[in-house]
């Protein structure tokens, strides 16, 4: 006898197989494929983009496959992105990975593509593609690309190069398999790509090794972050601090989980000034209160316990902190 959850799981698996077959069919139909990522990409974003590119290239050598957009300092080591002229787009299949809404897609030329496919593990906020595979049960978009390979490996070829970037994305978006989004499937797929021949130590060095300046900056954070009696922790990082410790906004904002292991804190946030963007990067993390609705209120989005947005100024940051503290207060009342 099938229980409700078993039936639901079976239905989702059948849907996933169906939509994967449709995606594979579209890939076969097009000679040119252009893959886009989101603004300020993280390793999961670049990993799923380049991983899919390498997967398609190895499986269909005659196709022209491009990965477009810009890197952050954190992702440059993962592989080169492509420069594509405007005239290539009108006859191309565009695939958008790890992003749920149009305003966060890097390179607006995605609109010029003949057809569009979306592959994303964030909650659905906007429908804009001809074909959309959106599933929040995956801990990372890289896990979705690995699943795409696993379920269709009779027609697809996974290379060492693809395995390397997919593992990097899976590793970082799960907090080294620590977050509660991790499932048995996540671990199994991590093991599959880990078996491929790439330099694990070199990969870890790019992701986790720190300079003396970096370590001093982390020490400053631990000595100067703020927190409330409701369990909210937060850190404001302005340009003066970035200059003092010789760190980039990319690196600084990536340290948000520095506050994640403090037992007094149930929600933590980083606010990092980015002169290049003219905005303040805002990262939300939680092990209790749901944060993606708060992020959406300020024009952002993401997962239930990991989200972000861009604030226009420090006055907006103050409002976010006030709302977040109230969220923590209400959450504690319900315990």
How should each PLM-predicted stretch be described?
Residues 36, 40, 96, 118-119, ...:
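Generic enzyme active-site microenvironment
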Residues 82-86, 134-137, 286-287:
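Short, hinge-like loop/turn segments at secondary-structure boundaries
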Residues 1-17:
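Short, Lys/Arg-enriched N-terminal segments with co-localized hydrophobic residues
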Residues 13-76, 86, 90-92, 175-335:
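Hydrophobic helix-and-loop "lid/oligomerization" segment in the mid-to-C-terminal part
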Residues 122-189:
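Short alpha-helices
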Residues 67, 96, 118, 133-135, ...:
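Structural signal for conserved beta-strand scaffold positions within catalytic alpha/beta enzyme cores
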Residues 51-53, 111-114, 134-135, 188:
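Glycine-rich, phosphate-binding/catalytic loops in enzymes
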Residues 77-131:
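Active-site cofactor/cluster-binding pocket
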